[in-house]
Amino acid sequence: MRDRRNFLARLAALGAALGLGATPADASAPAEARSSLLRDDPWVARLRGTHRVVFHSHLPTDGLALRWAQTFLDTQRTTYGVAEGDCSVVVGLNGRSIGWFFGDALWAEHPSIGEVMGTPGQSNPQRSLVNSLVSRGVILLACGNSIRASGQRFLPEAQRDDASARNAFAERVRATLLPGVEVVPSMVVTLQQAQDRGCRYIYAGG
């Protein structure tokens, strides 16, 4: 019997050393501490109304996500009599599609952007549409991960292996985004957040 008690004691000590009986820190913490770990990105506070939609694209597709956002608002108002104040429209771009959020200065500095977007030129052809959507309260979101990797997509091929060139390009992207565009950490999480808050998902990637 003594041997059995000694064995159980040693087993319990081993379990404690390995943390087998421990409770995860976040589960055992007070509710107030756990809630402090949860936060929304700033754009979430702008959601309004009962008609909510998120248009998503990772490919240029001639700015389809932007154009569909405009069509959604126009049709809701003119055909169904829905006021824009009762609509929340989110456009989330990642991958190559974030080029539509780049300012004209960056397009002029890097003609390779237009080539990647399928519209060679030194200015962003979607700039006026982006400005119009901003004025109508559309939430425009650019993926931070995609911005960080943007040099690998938009720089001339000869520069894409240059880490310093890629970093400089990403910094320039952030500095020259069109007014009204917000950067989110990760588009895949943003899409989940939007759908959790009642936004219907529409893929506009081609």
Residue locations for each model-derived region?
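N-terminal secretory signal peptides and thylakoid transit peptides that target proteins
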Residues: M1-G15
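Acidic helix-start/capping segments at beta-turn-to-alpha-helix junctions
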Residues: V82-L106
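Surface-exposed patches in mature extracellular/periplasmic domains of secreted proteins
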Residues: Q76-V90, A142-N145, G205
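Short glycine-rich or small-residue beta-strand-to-loop segments that form or flank ligand, phosphate
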Residues: R52-L59, V89-N94
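C-terminal segment of N-terminal export signals and the immediately downstream linker at the start
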Residues: G21-H51
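A charged helix-plus-loop insertion that forms the helical arch/lid used to bind
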Residues: A105-Q122
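A cross-taxonomic marker for long C-terminal extensions/tails that follow the last structured domain
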Residues: M117-G206
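Histidine-anchored nucleotide/phosphate-binding helix
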Residues: G63-V82
